[in-house]
Amino acid sequence: MAQFFEPSTDTNANFANSVSGQANSFFLPSIYSKKVLNFFRKASVVEAITNTDYAGEISAFGDSVKIIKEPVISVSSYTRNTDTSQTMLTDQELNLVVDQANAFKFIVDDIETNMSHVNFKEVATSSAAYSLKDAYDAAVLAEMFTGVSSSSPDHVIGSDSATADSTMTHATNSVDLLGSDGTGVDALDLMARMARLLDDQSVPEEGRWFVAPPSFYEELSQSGSKLLSVDFNAGQGSIRNGLVSTGKLRGFDMYKSNNIAATSNASGKVMAGHISSTATAQTILSTEVLRDPTSFGDIVRGLHVYGANVLRPEALVSAFYVVD
């Protein structure tokens, strides 16, 4: 009797050319897991704007990484033959808990696998990775917005209000961006104010970033300086991880994201900060392949775990804006 499915001759873990029950041993879950993570890291804005040094220390959901915050050392003047004052070191312990998880699961039918020219492994891997990225970015960005210092120092400019003004104060109104009516705050001026607030807290200039939704970048492109024109960006479009420019603007690496949570009344919100402000840890914990008991196909599923903690609230600034 002739075989309907030919045994796989794939020696490169090419999932789209192999069938479980035939010669499917070339599909290795560990290789698949690395493939997902590779797509993920190329897409995630959060990976680019947070401290990921602790990612290698997690191995399971619920893991906790203890972080010792750097002590502040006082400097005093010195006069010859006099005693010097000393600083007693105090350590502050912070926890980064991996307490969030997302999963993906899909089925690759045997017939689709063998009869289609589409590489289902690549298509499904890319789709799963971008879905994980969206969920991860949205959750961590929301936590970062919540973690912005709102007193001593107050780094929240405006509020989620439909009423706007041009003062850029920490009041109940949102910021009125310069629009078609010719009035309001230039988007670049708002960025300059956010940079100054970071300067006031001695936040290092190297490693600063700015993230905003597309509506803000539309206003920024119409700014009087035209700094985001094609000429400024050397003819390049979006590069990777949401980075929108090869150069810095007001000292910030510029990122664009659709995963900033929607506002209730304002047109949108933006955030700026330093890469040391927030620690994150994430990993593709496991992937599995098993036969679907109800059809002829393979179930592929994976588990992504992560955690985030705002370590330096003073190194974040947020602002709410209204576009006329």
Where do the language-model regions lie?
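Short, catalytically relevant binding-site loops at active-site mouths
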Residues: 146, 215-219, 260-262
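Short Gly/aromatic-enriched secondary-structure transition segments
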Residues: 80-87
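Sequence/fold signature of self-assembling virion shell proteins
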Residues: 2-51, 56-74, 95-97, 115, ...
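Generic detector of well-ordered alpha-helical segments enriched in charged/polar residues
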Residues: 28-29, 33-37, 41, 141, ...
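Alpha-helical scaffold segments that mediate packing/assembly in large oligomeric complexes
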Residues: 111-196, 320-324
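Structured, hydrophobic secondary-structure cores that serve as assembly/anchoring elements
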Residues: 61-66, 72, 85, 92-120, ...
